[in-house]
Amino acid sequence: MDFHRANRNLQLVESGVSDGRNPESFSLDETQVPVSSGFSSDSDKDQQEQIFINTQVQGRLDEAEEADKVRANLGQFRYDSQDSAISPKHKSAIQRPSARTTKRSSSSQRRKAPTKAQSLLKQLSGKHAKVQDMIKYQQKLDSLAGSQQRAKSKGKTTKTKKQQEKRYDTYNANEWQHIYNLLLEKFPHTRPSEVEDVYQYLYGDESEDQPLWNESQRPIEPESQDLGFLPPPPADKQRVSVLSLSQVMDDKHSREPDEDIIVPDSTDEEYIVIPIPSSPQPLRPPLATKPPLLTKPPLKKVESDAGTPKTAHSPSDGVIDLTNGSFKVVKSLISPLKEETAQVQVPATRMPTLGTTPNLAPTKEQPLRYRLHRSQLESFSAVEGLIVCSPGPSQDDVPVPDTESEDSAAEDHCMVELQPSILASRTPSPSVQSDWNSQSAQQLRQSMKSLGLKTSRSKRQMLHSLQQASQVLEIDTGGQENQRQEIHDYLTSLVQSSPVLLEKVYTFQPIASKELLTKLTEANPFVDVIDEYTIREWADYQGICLTTS
């Protein structure tokens, strides 16, 4: 054991307790490396290096402080021309406004109550900004009109009432009634005076002058001045002189008025000029009197007196002479467009004495027509292919009442048409009926789909539907291409027999599908068997607009 080392350690501990030092406060060099003369050179080197590092850091800090001072001195000259009055310590109070999501209105706008016109326009359109622009533009026009009116009446001493500019709207009576009903539905407690104010705002005050539209609807007043009689046109204006190219280019030829080529007017007939009589006769007969009918003059026997001289008038005279001969009718005055046809006399033996009577029995293609009383239609409602038509009165179908039923009105009767082909094909043939019974339910469904009929689960219902279809259509088991077209033609005939549906189709009005099916089913229950897809396909082909509602 090294006693010298232990003694030395005890001395070090004893000296540390006596000095009052804390072992925790010892540095790393003092605890690990004892202070001796041999380690003095290493500690001096460490101190010198630490001093060198501190000088570098301090130099950097000094440079940073100097740069800050320079920036502070130069910052006051940066915006001297703009912000000279503003203190650099305080920021400007004027800032960019932030985006406002809500639209604020001024206190004056909140205090001002909206007018009835503004509320009405807002209720009708639903766009507040659009209505405000319209009202501002109208107020601008009113202010311009008012300024012009004041400039015109500046020299007058009396104050004239500013005439408001009349405004006309495109609303007719039906549209205004619709608007009036909407206002009453929206505001049930509206007084009639308020509605009248809105009407006067749109159409103006009726107490003032009549609007332009009312003025345009007035009948034309007859002119007070008497037109008198038209003077006869001069004779020289009835003819147009035309020269040919050779006559114009020929300088040696002396042209005279009589040698000109005269081209008559297209309305003149054989150079006839009928002068207007000078007697005071009205040009137009009064409307109350009926115009005289043009009657054919009676034939007159040719006189056998050959000694009496007769003046023969040429067709170009156009003069009616009543002194000599019979009355001569100018054909151009009666019918200027009718051409004269040569009349050939046929001897009496040529004329047939027995005329052929028309065949009154209808053919197979012609429909059978019956005239029935409307009370008897219920008993014939079960007949398939029966078309009820009520045409307008004509000369061919004039109802002649019986002597016993003279009191009955003509409107109580109607005409009924029935096609003979439908009568022949009402019941299916036994071969077709046996084919249906022999087919399975799946085959019946396929055949009904190809025909355009509704399918069902039970075979009995499908056979009943096919039997109803056979009463209207000619069902053939061989081919089924034309049977769908026959259904389309049958639906078209049903629509043609209904005046209400026909009017809607002609005017391109949309028809509800339920309404169409109901009316067609009432006309014939067979429509209830037809598939809805087939009916829509037929409507597309015919241009009928169907709606679901």
UniProtKB/Swiss-Prot annotation:
Residues 24-41 have a biased composition (Polar residues). Phosphorylated in response to DNA damage. GO terms for cellular component: Slx1-Slx4 complex. Residues 1-48, 81-127, 142-165, 275-319, 390-410 are annotated as: Disordered. It holds the Pfam family Slx4. InterPro entries: Structure-sp_endonuc_su_Slx4. The keyword Nucleus applies. Belongs to the SLX4 family. Forms a heterodimer with SLX1. This is Structure-specific endonuclease subunit SLX4. It comes from Zygosaccharomyces rouxii (strain ATCC 2623 / CBS 732 / NBRC 1130 / NCYC 568 / NRRL Y-229).
